[in-house]
From Swiss-Prot:
Compartments, as annotated in UniProt: Cytoplasm
A biological process from GO: methylation
UniProt-annotated binding residues for S-adenosyl-L-methionine: T150, G171, D193, N232
PANTHER family found in the cross-reference section: ELECTRON TRANSFER FLAVOPROTEIN BETA SUBUNIT LYSINE METHYLTRANSFERASE
UniProt keyword list: Cytoplasm, Methyltransferase, S-adenosyl-L-methionine, Transferase
Cellular compartments per GO CC: cytosol
EC category: transferase
Role according to the record: Methylates ribosomal protein L11.
Domain of life, source organism: Bacteria
The keyword Methyltransferase is assigned to this record: yes
Lineage of origin: Bacteria, Pseudomonadati, Pseudomonadota, Betaproteobacteria, Neisseriales
One Pfam short name: PrmA
Protein's name according to its UniProt entry: Ribosomal protein L11 methyltransferase
Amino acid sequence: MPYQQITINVNDAVAERLADALMEHGALSAAIEDAYAGTQNEQAIFGEPGMPAEQIWQQSKVIALFGEHDEAAAIIQIAAQECGLKDLAYTGETIEDQDWVRLTQSQFDPIRISDRLWITPSWHEAPEGTAVNLRLDPGLAFGTGSHPTTRLCLKWLDTQLKNGESVLDYGCGSGILTIAALKLGAGSAVGVDIDEQAVRAGKDNAEQNNVDAQFFLPDGLPQGQFDVVVANILANPLRMLGEMLAARTKQGGRIVLSGLLDEQAEELGGIYSQWFDLDPAETEEGWARLSGTKR
């Protein structure tokens, strides 16, 4: 059975209300996406400690699905009126029914990080059976290996981590770096995130990968220092957390920072140079990674 798919560009003030109104009046589904997804103006939305969390992109698109014979135009008009919108422009297309699970899975292929490290969704065969394969499915927590900052951190772990070292992954998201550290030889690894959903996702992913990782909310993190501290978050929390991350790093231990843009590396380097001897920044697709050794 074919469906009508309608796309409406709106601002963040009305996106959620419009999606709810469309559902209330008969849409089969309504999703909100970044209107600039896939372009240079794409807007990343993450919660930052101490900052109000943005929930909706400033410019969003509401994508609604209707049945083949639904009066989509009339429903859109009613929903628009309820949201105080006039002359609401939209585009529409007909899409055929299909196996949506299979379609979604087909969009995620194994990701090669290095000669020996792969990120592989659970529904794929491991591309190289003798390689280190992280089984990780796209989900609700950030971190699938596709983002440059995640790859930068994974490459550091792949080449620099020493067997038996203890690792703290602060802002762990899906737990990808925590799990990778253990698979690459860490003696222990702990993931921390401000989002309970990320903590749950980390535990689930660790179980899927048969590794003994621990995950905590910040208040639950036990006292202690680590040989390696990794923080793949954003520039603002990295500014705020510098002293704490330094305190969690053993003397002679190492820190790995990412989630910052190339142009932010110099400023962040100035902050962390209080505690660490920093290596030259590594960059990929406009994102940067800092690393260094604690004095």
